[in-house]
Amino acid sequence: MTDSITAPAPAPTATISSRSITPISTQGNSHDVEKTAPSIPHDDDDDDRTAHEYPTTTEKGQNSDPSKEQDEAGPPVSEDDNLTFPEGGRGWYCVLGGFLCTFISFGYANSAGIFVEYYQNELLQGQSSSNLAWIASFQYFLLFFCGSLTGRIFDTGYYRPMFAAGIFLFLLGQCMLSLSTQYYQIFLTQGIILGISYGCIFQVGVTVPQQWFHRRRASAMGIVAAGSSTGGIVFPVMIKNLIPMIGFGWTMRVIALIAAFCLSLAFVCLKTRLPPSIDVHTPQGWRAVKWFDFSVFRQAEYSFFVLGSALAMLGLYSPFSFCDVWTTTHNIPANGYWLAVLNAASMFGRILPGFLADRVGRTNTLFPHLLAAGILMLVFPLTNNLTGMIFFSILYGFASGSYVSLIPASIGQLGPTSTIGTRLGMAFAGSSLGGLVGTPIAGAILGPDNTNWWGMSVFSGVMVIGGAMNSHEMKP
């Protein structure tokens, strides 16, 4: 009994916790390794890659200096995004695939101005600018609105069948458009069928690359979004020059062949990295799917941002739809090529702000660009000569370009990457209302004789400035 009382207690076992280890920062690598994160199950053959094949970005450790952490890591990561991001590697193939998706979908939709001019002067003479604007507006509306459904499909893991359906609908719509001669036929084929195909293609193109990047996400999305500007350069010039040579029908078929090649290549390049966030292999899983998940709007920052995006959409694309009408009515030289100039400037406005956004914050970059676009829109009627049109096209194209690249990247930082499809989809659905009515309202204000340019400019400019103010409510 005495021995049991007086016997010395055993020495405590030394324990080592992850908190007792000082983070190690490597000076020679731009990606600091400060904490080991669990590996992520992949859906492709990249599972056996070693950590040395490409750098990774992880969540910062708890012992990090908060101020230094914000400076080095850029935008904050959502709390349940404790993931490792490759920041490259196969992700660059996904960026290429996303570029091709936006080239065919948003890029072709950005060619609306050349179609409005051709329909008004040739194929659909007598139709007003407002009536013709409904064709383009329905394309933008469905491109974004379909995201509310396609985003949920993406999160269930069925992005490839959805993408294949988008390819089929695009080729079907384009071939049927080549045979159309009446307004209702063009509205159904170009406005409805092509619009739905854009929604399937665009959603996959802007969502998959975000699973591969966090620190470089805005830069990667800038490259992806540049595809829409590239399409806005190529397609108007192609259409303007091919129609006099081979006719409207064969021009549409040539575009269908180009799209078939580009989208097939994108289909090969795009691969998701994370497992589906919704398990639909059981009846309970399917019942759990909410095709319209309005719960995301409980987050105030998200709701403000979507509202700002919708307001900006009401006026942002008015110059893209009516610039050729403006240059025709004011006898400005190089008519038919100004849409290409706008999109060329927009391409730089989508890439360069993306690199800046990764350093100073995404909304910190988006706000001044949208504000500048709104101010430029207010003075659009002053560009009634060649010099003015050159300056406006370059400045407005660059300022408005950040919208397409930074909107998805900004939404991506508001929640976990595993549900990014749903959050992007619901945001696009909210923005779609602006895309649906914005251009027709601008066309109605413009009037049947295309004379009220000041009214159209004030409406569009005020909407874009309002969108900029709402987007600024979100943290950088």
Give the predicted meaning of each segment:
Residues 104, 108-119, 297-364, 408, ...:
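Extracytoplasmic gate region of multi-pass secondary transporters
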Residues 330, 336, 340-346, 350-414, ...:
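C-terminal transmembrane helical hairpin of 12-TM major facilitator-type secondary transporters
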Residues 119-120, 153-154, 234-247, 327-328, ...:
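Interfacial helix-cap and linker-helix signal at transmembrane-aqueous boundaries
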Residues 215-216, 223-274:
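Helix-loop-helix hairpin linking two adjacent transmembrane segments in secondary transporters
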Residues 119, 191, 198-213, 220-221, ...:
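Intracellular juxtamembrane helix-capping segments at the cytosolic ends
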Residues 1-88, 272, 280-288, 476:
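Intrinsically disordered, low-complexity terminal tails of fungal membrane proteins
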Residues 145-185, 357:
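Conserved MFS/SLC helix-loop-helix module at the cytosolic interface between two early adjacent transmembrane helices
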Residues 99, 103-104, 173-174, 183-200, ...:
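Hydrophobic core of transmembrane alpha-helices in multi-pass small-molecule transporters
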